[in-house]
Amino acid sequence: MKAWPVLGIVFVQTILLLAHWFIYHTWIVFWGDMGAWPMLALRAAIFLLAFSFIAAALFGFYFANRWVTMLYRLAAVWLGLLNFFFVAACLCWLARLTLALLGLTTNNPLLGAMFYSLAVVASLYGLVNARLIRVRRVPIQLGGLPASWRGRAALVVSDLHLGHVNGSGFSRRIVELAARLNPQIIFFPGDLFDGAKADATALAEPFRALAPPFGSYFSTGNHDEFGNAARYGEVLTRVGIRVLTNEKVIVDGLQIVGVPNGDSGYPIRLRATLESLELNPGTASILLNHVPNRLPIIEQAGISLQLSGHTHGGQIFPFTWLTRRAFGKFTYGLQRFGALQVYTSSGAGTWGPPMRVGTSPEVVLLTFE
């Protein structure tokens, strides 16, 4: 294993340990000592939970069986609970300080019970909300759009993260949605797979039923590249999804381009790739680029519309706020960068906690006007 993944794991594990310590410390201050045996059990549980997600993720990267899947799902749910327990602990201390400054009596157990209960409610809501895929309908106008495409619809499906949490049943749900929406073309702009060790063939097999008249197209995201991207590509090709790797196809006059996530991150490489494709500036073009980045280069290349995912809209609070600090207005939705239009989808699936709070899972139906 290279040094940087190890350092990343150590960094994340350190953050998780500190978060668990903070929650434990808050529990002690606000509820007090519960006795020798209960406290020993609490410490042991906190210690094991602190390592659960990293351990489950590592197991999930190398092994695929029902026990690993169960461990990963439980650890992922706990990671979401941890997030909201951490927020609850912060609110406990903030409320205690506020009451003290106002000279009011502080009821620590009541404060703790109130905020930690809200954390559980938020987590339960997030679990349910993450399974309710919305259909977002977006009309769009592109300069140079061939007349034959006017009135047609394209389905954009990003960030499924198929693996230990979202299995083949999730794939079937997407196929059923597509059948109901009846798009003429389907785009998968990355992170179709989670990158974990899994049966890619079984996960992708439901997509064989997709039958848009002008085909389905995919370009890799960062999680696809964490796993066996070549294997994923073979599997998708077999079920009828065209994998675009630094290439352009012309579909009934519309230029469709796909760039792998690993290449789009390098400005010089991306610029050279787009130049080599010899795009026709007078005809509409759509780029599948997983991350909503390198927009000056992409606009300069003459791309009409970029389809992205990656951000999940932040997925759960407070990461919704942090993601917007990182990507600005391109965190979500249809935005403009000069002559370039960018649609960033919040995605249909989840990564890590199978929860969504402050965002909604979606597929996007673009209607060309």
Task: Go through each PLM region and give its residues.
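Non-catalytic terminal accessory segments
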Residues: 1-131
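Short, mixed-charge, low-aromatic patches
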Residues: 31-34, 47-53, 109, 128-135, ...
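Canonical alpha-helical transmembrane segment with a positive-inside/aromatic-interface signature
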Residues: 105-150, 154-156, 162-167
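Soluble catalytic domains of enzymes that build or remodel membrane lipids, polysaccharides, and related
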Residues: 141-369
